[in-house]
Amino acid sequence: MASPDWGYDDKNGPEQWSKLYPIANGNNQSPVDIKTSETKHDTSLKPISVSYNPATAKEIINVGHSFHVNFEDNDNRSVLKGGPFSDSYRLFQFHFHWGSTNEHGSEHTVDGVKYSAELHVAHWNSAKYSSLAEAASKADGLAVIGVLMKVGEANPKLQKVLDALQAIKTKGKRAPFTNFDPSTLLPSSLDFWTYPGSLTHPPLYESVTWIICKESISVSSEQLAQFRSLLSNVEGDNAVPMQHNNRPTQPLKGRTVRASF
């Protein structure tokens, strides 16, 4: 089977993406390093409010470079509000990024510090657009909550997700994943940084308002190993474990990172 036109190895990885996706060198690319001394406290930022209905959880899919947990997004049962937003954004997915070792794996970094993994909870602007497809490339189309994951204690809240990975070992496999509220994965404090950015993998649309939580969540070494044991090949092909899927940080290019705290 033909390999996708992008991935995370030397031949098709982040250094090569700009050949096919010139926006890779754009002015609003993600992830970034958050330099805390250069962030700007903004009193106009409201608290983040998430209201997710567990009944909207739908399925888990191995997409070859990661796995996605997808949600029903035909109505506003699961939404993100507040923060920098005047519109409500509808939940459609969460996924993770990780590295080949526990020393790195997050996409965003804080004062240069790399975390072991990163959770992304993704939403689209259902107040202005009629579908994810329509919203995905628009400047105000997407809102993603990023949560840094620090290696340490096992995180019991991840267990249902990890238990589901057995059923989606290889690329293209999918399985039902129901009755789950991803707000249970968020840290207890929703203090956040926010900045205008992009999807962190192709097509790299500069359509994401990022909400990066100040507080991290825990993940154990064994739990990270379960992420890496997923395979990026289709069933029957040689086993190629998903060792890493994190893009390096991109230059801020004059953007301001605002802080809610």
Swiss-Prot record:
Cellular component GO terms, alphabetical: cytoplasm; cytosol; extracellular exosome
EC code: 4.2.1.1, 4.2.1.69
Name of a matching Pfam family: Carb_anhydrase
Keyword field contains Transport: no
Residues the record lists as binding substrate: 200-201
Cysteine disulfide links: none
Locations listed in the record: Cytoplasm
Start and end residues of each stretch annotated as Disordered: 1-31, 241-261
Domain of life according to the entry: Eukaryota
Domain spans labelled Alpha-carbonic anhydrase: 4-261
Cofactors named for this entry: Zn(2+)
InterPro entries assigned to the protein according to its UniProt record, in alphabetical order: CA_dom, CA_dom_sf, Carbonic_anhydrase_a-class, Carbonic_anhydrase_a-class_CS
Predominant place of localization: cytoplasm
GO molecular function: arylesterase activity; carbonate dehydratase activity; cyanamide hydratase activity; hydro-lyase activity; zinc ion binding
Annotated Zn(2+) 1 binding sites: 95, 97, 120
Catalytic activity: hydrogencarbonate + H(+) = CO2 + H2O; urea = cyanamide + H2O
Protein keywords: Acetylation, Cytoplasm, Lyase, Metal-binding, Zinc
Outcome recorded upon mutating residue 68 to R: In variant Michigan-1; confers enhanced esterase activity and an additional zinc binding site
SMART domains registered for this protein in UniProt: Carb_anhydrase
Family of the protein in this entry: Belongs to the alpha-carbonic anhydrase family.
The protein's name in its UniProt record: Carbonic anhydrase 1
Originating species: Homo sapiens (Human)
Gene: CA1
